[in-house]
């Protein structure tokens, strides 16, 4: 059963989700994240995760 039209809830909150959203807004960070992973890409652009 869907709740609030959001689909199934995540089994646990993703602590990196806010950083993922920031990185996705930067095309260079987003592209790098596809290659090396979110944490490494985020660190290169924005500092420690």
Curated annotation (Swiss-Prot):
UniProt-annotated location(s): Secreted
Keyword Zinc: no
Post-translational modification: Gamma-carboxyglutamate residues are formed by vitamin K dependent carboxylation by GGCX. These residues are essential for the binding of calcium. Decarboxylation promotes the hormone activity.
Modified residues (4-hydroxyproline): 9
Modification Pyrrolidone carboxylic acid, positions: 1
One of the record's GO molecular function terms: calcium ion binding
Domain of life: Eukaryota
InterPro entries from the UniProt entry: GLA-like_dom_SF, GLA_domain, Osteocalcin, Osteocalcin/MGP
Domain Gla: 1-47
Modified residues (4-carboxyglutamate): 17, 21, 24
First-listed, main subcellular location of the protein, grouped into a coarse class: secreted
Keyword Calcium: yes
Residues binding Ca(2+) 2, per UniProt: 21, 24
Alphabetized UniProt keyword annotations: Biomineralization, Calcium, Disulfide bond, Gamma-carboxyglutamic acid, Hormone, Hydroxylation, Metal-binding, Pyrrolidone carboxylic acid, Secreted
Cysteine pairings via disulfide bonds: 23-29
Binding positions for Ca(2+) 1 per the UniProt entry: 17
A cellular component term, taken from the record's GO annotations: extracellular region
Binding site for Ca(2+) 3: 24, 30
PROSITE patterns named in the record: GLA_1, GLA_2
Any single biological process term in GO: regulation of bone mineralization
Family: Belongs to the osteocalcin/matrix Gla protein family.
PANTHER family: OSTEOCALCIN
Role summary: The carboxylated form is one of the main organic components of the bone matrix, which constitutes 1-2% of the total bone protein: it acts as a negative regulator of bone formation and is required to limit bone formation without impairing bone resorption or mineralization. The carboxylated form binds strongly to apatite and calcium. The uncarboxylated form acts as a hormone secreted by osteoblasts, which regulates different cellular processes, such as energy metabolism, male fertility and brain development. Regulates of energy metabolism by acting as a hormone favoring pancreatic beta-cell proliferation, insulin secretion and sensitivity and energy expenditure.
Name of protein: Osteocalcin
Name of the gene: BGLAP
């Amino acid at each position: 059963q869907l709740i609030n039209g959001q689909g199934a809830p995540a089994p646990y909150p993703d602590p990196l989700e806010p950083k993922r959203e920031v990185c996705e807004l930067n095309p260079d960070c987003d592209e790098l994240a596809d290659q090396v992973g979110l944490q490494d890409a985020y660190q290169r652009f924005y500092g420690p995760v």
